[in-house]
């Protein structure tokens, strides 16, 4: 009988330790877009998200990025759009065109492209997804390009031209957009 009690206790303790890493891993990102309270990074965009009137040619679900305004618009039904602040490509890294969302990822890994590594050999060759990853909480991959609409581990750069061509958003805003935008959605990038 004593052997069964020890065996049962051992199994319970073993299960506690076996599930602890999974619990820690899931709790690390449980708050999809909110850094810990000890983190000094701002939690909100310096440019608040808002619903604005829209009377243009694009259908609901279309994403319009106006890089000169540093704003992204998600077209809604009823002649409205959600407007978000974004960070855009710095001089020499701006672009314009029409594409679509090819893929979406939560807490994406980041592998800098070869061109970026040539410019910045100090960068890691690969970084797993997480709060310190430059892609932030979500990424929407733009078809036919190396660019993404993604979160950021530097939310204070929203409203600035600092990226290598990607469109940066706060983790809160990119999580909101990620839930609303579908794979295949049209993306129009204007200068």
Predicted segments with their positions:
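Sec/Tat signal peptide C-region and signal peptidase I cleavage site
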Residues: 19-25
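Positively charged n-region of N-terminal signal peptides that target proteins for export
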Residues: 1-4
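Exported/periplasmic cell-wall-interacting domains
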Residues: 78, 83, 92-98, 105-191
């Amino acid at each position: 009988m004593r052997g069964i009690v020890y065996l049962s206790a051992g199994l319970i303790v073993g299960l506690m330790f076996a599930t602890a890493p999974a619990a820690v891993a899931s709790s690390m990102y449980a708050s999809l877009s909110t850094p810990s309270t000890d983190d000094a990074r701002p939690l909100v965009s310096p440019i608040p998200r808002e619903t604005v009137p829209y009377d243009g040619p694009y259908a609901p679900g279309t994403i319009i990025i106006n890089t000169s305004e540093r704003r992204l618009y998600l077209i809604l039904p009823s002649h409205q759009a959600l407007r978000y602040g974004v960070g855009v490509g710095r001089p020499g890294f701006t672009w314009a065109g029409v594409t679509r969302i090819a893929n979406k990822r939560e807490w994406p890994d980041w592998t800098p492209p070869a061109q970026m590594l040539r410019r910045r050999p100090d960068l890691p060759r690969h970084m797993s997804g997480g709060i310190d990853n430059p892609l932030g909480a979500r990424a929407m991959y733009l078809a036919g390009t190396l660019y993404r609409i993604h979160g950021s581990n530097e939310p204070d750069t929203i409203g600035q031209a600092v990226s290598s061509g990607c469109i940066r958003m706060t983790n809160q805003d990119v999580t909101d957009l990620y839930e609303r935008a579908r794979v295949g959605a049209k993306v129009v990038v204007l200068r």
